[in-house]
Protein backbone atom coordinates (compact mmCIF):
# COMPACT_ATOMS: atom_id res chain seq x y z
CA UNK A 1 0.00 0.00 0.00
CA UNK A 2 1.53 3.29 -1.14
CA UNK A 3 0.78 6.50 0.74
CA UNK A 4 -0.84 8.93 -1.66
CA UNK A 5 0.23 12.19 -0.06
CA UNK A 6 3.14 13.84 1.69
CA UNK A 7 1.27 13.56 5.00
CA UNK A 8 0.88 9.82 4.49
CA UNK A 9 4.59 9.41 3.73
CA UNK A 10 5.51 11.49 6.78
CA UNK A 11 3.21 9.44 9.00
CA UNK A 12 4.68 6.17 7.72
CA UNK A 13 8.26 7.36 8.34
CA UNK A 14 7.35 8.57 11.83
CA UNK A 15 5.65 5.28 12.71
CA UNK A 16 8.68 3.29 11.54
CA UNK A 17 11.08 5.48 13.54
CA UNK A 18 8.90 5.27 16.64
CA UNK A 19 8.57 1.49 16.34
CA UNK A 20 12.36 1.06 15.93
CA UNK A 21 13.11 3.35 18.88
CA UNK A 22 10.56 1.64 21.13
CA UNK A 23 11.90 -1.79 20.21
CA UNK A 24 15.50 -0.75 20.91
CA UNK A 25 14.53 0.84 24.23
CA UNK A 26 12.62 -2.20 25.46
CA UNK A 27 15.49 -4.51 24.51
CA UNK A 28 17.99 -2.33 26.40
CA UNK A 29 15.80 -2.16 29.51
CA UNK A 30 15.21 -5.92 29.41
CA UNK A 31 18.95 -6.61 29.03
CA UNK A 32 19.83 -4.31 31.96
CA UNK A 33 17.13 -5.89 34.14
CA UNK A 34 18.43 -9.39 33.41
CA UNK A 35 22.05 -8.37 34.02
CA UNK A 36 21.17 -6.74 37.34
CA UNK A 37 19.91 -10.08 38.65
CA UNK A 38 23.18 -11.88 37.87
CA UNK A 39 26.32 -11.82 39.98
CA UNK A 40 29.29 -9.88 38.66
CA UNK A 41 31.97 -12.26 37.32
CA UNK A 42 34.80 -10.03 38.63
CA UNK A 43 33.76 -9.61 42.28
CA UNK A 44 31.04 -12.28 42.63
CA UNK A 45 28.53 -9.75 44.05
CA UNK A 46 25.36 -8.13 42.77
CA UNK A 47 27.10 -4.95 41.57
CA UNK A 48 24.41 -3.86 39.14
CA UNK A 49 21.51 -3.91 41.59
CA UNK A 50 20.03 -0.71 42.92
CA UNK A 51 19.66 -0.05 46.63
CA UNK A 52 16.02 -0.18 47.68
CA UNK A 53 16.43 0.62 51.39
CA UNK A 54 14.34 3.56 52.59
CA UNK A 55 16.44 6.65 53.36
CA UNK A 56 19.12 5.76 50.79
CA UNK A 57 19.58 6.71 47.14
CA UNK A 58 20.02 4.10 44.39
CA UNK A 59 23.77 3.89 45.09
CA UNK A 60 23.33 3.16 48.81
CA UNK A 61 24.31 6.64 50.03
CA UNK A 62 22.36 8.14 52.91
CA UNK A 63 19.90 10.81 51.78
CA UNK A 64 19.77 13.98 53.85
CA UNK A 65 16.24 14.76 54.86
CA UNK A 66 15.24 18.11 56.32
CA UNK A 67 15.26 16.55 59.79
CA UNK A 68 18.95 15.59 59.67
CA UNK A 69 20.38 18.64 57.85
CA UNK A 70 22.71 20.50 60.25
CA UNK A 71 21.57 23.91 61.50
CA UNK A 72 23.76 26.72 62.82
CA UNK A 73 22.93 29.72 64.94
CA UNK A 74 23.42 33.07 63.19
CA UNK A 75 26.04 35.26 64.87
CA UNK A 76 23.99 38.40 64.35
CA UNK A 77 20.30 37.55 64.83
CA UNK A 78 20.68 34.21 66.71
CA UNK A 79 18.24 32.41 64.35
CA UNK A 80 18.76 28.77 63.40
CA UNK A 81 19.81 28.58 59.73
CA UNK A 82 20.38 25.47 57.58
CA UNK A 83 24.05 24.87 56.79
CA UNK A 84 23.44 25.17 53.05
CA UNK A 85 21.96 28.67 53.48
CA UNK A 86 24.16 29.97 56.30
CA UNK A 87 26.67 31.98 54.24
CA UNK A 88 23.97 33.73 52.21
CA UNK A 89 21.97 34.49 55.36
CA UNK A 90 24.98 35.86 57.21
CA UNK A 91 25.85 38.08 54.27
CA UNK A 92 22.32 39.51 54.21
CA UNK A 93 22.12 39.71 57.99
CA UNK A 94 25.28 41.80 58.20
CA UNK A 95 23.98 44.03 55.39
CA UNK A 96 26.99 43.49 53.22
CA UNK A 97 25.51 41.91 50.16
CA UNK A 98 27.34 42.65 46.94
CA UNK A 99 24.62 44.90 45.55
CA UNK A 100 24.48 46.96 48.75
CA UNK A 101 28.25 47.23 48.97
CA UNK A 102 28.46 48.38 45.36
CA UNK A 103 25.71 50.96 45.73
CA UNK A 104 27.22 52.33 48.97
CA UNK A 105 30.69 52.61 47.45
CA UNK A 106 29.37 54.47 44.40
CA UNK A 107 27.39 56.83 46.63
CA UNK A 108 30.47 57.44 48.76
CA UNK A 109 32.59 58.16 45.67
CA UNK A 110 29.92 60.53 44.32
CA UNK A 111 29.83 62.43 47.65
CA UNK A 112 33.61 62.78 47.68
CA UNK A 113 33.59 64.05 44.09
CA UNK A 114 31.00 66.73 45.02
CA UNK A 115 33.05 67.90 48.03
CA UNK A 116 36.23 68.25 45.96
CA UNK A 117 34.52 70.55 43.40
Curated annotation (Swiss-Prot):
Molecular function per GO: transcription coactivator activity; zinc ion binding
Zinc fingers (SGF11-type), renumbered ranges: 72-93
Keywords on record: Activator, Chromatin regulator, Metal-binding, Nucleus, Transcription, Transcription regulation, Zinc, Zinc-finger
Record flagged with keyword Zinc: yes
Residue numbers binding Zn(2+): 74, 77, 89, 93
Keyword Heme recorded: no
Main location: nucleus
One Pfam entry name: Sgf11
Domains (record comment): The long N-terminal helix forms part of the 'assembly lobe' of the SAGA deubiquitination module. The C-terminal SGF11-type zinc-finger domain together with the C-terminal catalytic domain of UBP8 forms the 'catalytic lobe' of the SAGA deubiquitination module.
Name assigned to this protein: SAGA complex subunit Sgf11
Species of provenance: Schizosaccharomyces pombe (strain 972 / ATCC 24843)
Gene: sgf11
Amino acid sequence: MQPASLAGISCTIFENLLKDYTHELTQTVHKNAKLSLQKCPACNKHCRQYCTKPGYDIYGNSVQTPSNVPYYSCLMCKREIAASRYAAHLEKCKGRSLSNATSYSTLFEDDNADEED
